[in-house]
Design a protein with these regions (language model features):
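C-terminal subregions of glycosyltransferases and related glycan-biosynthesis enzymes
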Residues: 154-159, 187, 192, 199, ...
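A conserved acidic beta->alpha catalytic loop
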Residues: 40-49, 68, 92
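Glycine-rich, basic loop-to-helix element that forms the pyrophosphate-binding segment
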Residues: 66-83, 96
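Short aromatic/hydrophobic "clamp" motif used to bind/position activated sugar donors
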Residues: 88
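Short loop->beta transition adjacent to catalytic acidic/histidine clusters or analogous donor-positioning motifs
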Residues: 3-7, 27-38, 46, 59-62
Length: 327
């Protein structure tokens, strides 16, 4: 029997609230030739019992428990490290896979070139009131050169190719290891690793909505908004990234300057979300932390971001209250 070519890596810490649903969706896949590696980060709720039950019933479930509490990012890296396959698909304990998620993923792997290191997919969103965004029809694969993706990301103050989240990401494990895994300095450790991967390799986007992202207040994104960490992380990361990969990417002086403006676009998007959620006090506190030179350009950028956000959420508002859209 040949070894699987792909594993699912699932990190968890006290995930008893949603874990069983996630495991059920993974193990019910139409494509079954994979292993599921779960890294339990010293959970002290019902998580260990749930995992033991599933491991006893399905040999594909491999559980490894950390004896000591480690950081979230360390546990992400630990989960990936448990996999021994060429490709790894990430999964969060609170999200769901469509029944043909792995089938679509493996079909993409079968046709991509050796230059491809990262595969992303589209997703639906599930809110606390039970509303799930409508499904759309699947469309063909889109393959992009990594350098093209980065340059488009750096243009237009961040309006560019969509990069995957944790649950929508599949990657070559060898490249993940070569890059040193996720960096726990950053709240957007996933996006920043993808950018580093794509400085070396190419990217494929699956427009099929084969995962469901559950929106709730315990997410990393919610933490990033609450502290406005996104802005300051981008401000620190971009110069470091340009210094490391700028020459390899052939970035012109103009492109380097645009890259350094990216945190402005991120800040505008963050503030637009906070304003839409009615968190004015948080925005005012955040503005005091920004460089003075940012304040004037932030006005039109934030206004533009608010217009875009309102358009994006127009279909959601009749179904989901703002406090659930922005937990």
């Amino acid at each position: 029997m040949t070894a699987p070519q792909i594993s699912v890596a699932l990190p968890v810490r006290n995930g008893a609230n949603y874990l069983a649903e996630a495991l059920d969706s993974i193990l019910a896949q139409t494509y079954a030739d994979f292993e599921l590696h779960v890294s339990d980060n010293a959970s002290d709720d019902a998580t260990p019992a749930i995992l033991a039950d599933y491991a006893a019933r399905d040999a594909r479930v491999k559980v490894s428990r950390s004896a000591e509490l480690i950081s979230q990012v360390e546990n992400m890296n630990r989960a990936v490290g448990l996999a021994q396959t060429q490709w790894v698909r990430m999964m969060c304990h609170d999200d769901l896979m469509r029944a043909d998620c792995m089938e679509h993923t493996v079909a993409a792997i079968a046709i991509v070139s050796e230059a491809v290191a990262l595969i992303g997919n589209d997703e639906r969103h599930l809110f606390a009131n039970g509303y799930c965004t409508p499904a759309v029809s699947d469309a063909p694969l889109q393959c992009s050169g990594g350098q093209e993706v980065i340059k488009r990301r750096f243009s237009g103050l961040g309006v560019a190719v969509v990069l995957p989240s944790i649950t929508t990401a599949t990657f070559r494990k060898s490249m993940f290891d070569e890059m040193g895994g996720f960096d726990d300095r950053w709240v957007h450790f996933d996006i920043f690793l993808w950018l580093r991967l794509l400085a070396e390799r190419d990217y494929v986007w699956l427009s099929a909505q084969i995962t469901i992202n559950r929106i709730h207040g315990g997410q990393i994104a919610a933490d990033a908004r609450s502290a406005l960490r996104s802005v300051f992380d981008y401000r620190a990361f971009i110069p470091e990234f340009v210094s490391e990969f700028g020459d390899k990417l052939g970035l012109t002086p103009v492109e380097r300057a645009r890259a350094r403006l990216l945190p402005l676009g991120v800040a505008a998007t963050s503030y637009a979300s906070e304003l839409q959620a009615g968190r004015w006090a948080r925005v005012l506190r955040g503005l005091r932390l920004l460089p003075n030179a940012w304040l004037l350009p932030m006005i039109p950028l934030t206004a533009r971001a608010i217009v875009k956000e309102r358009r994006r959420l127009k279909a959601l508002r009749p179904h989901v209250p703002a406090k659930m859209i922005y937990p």
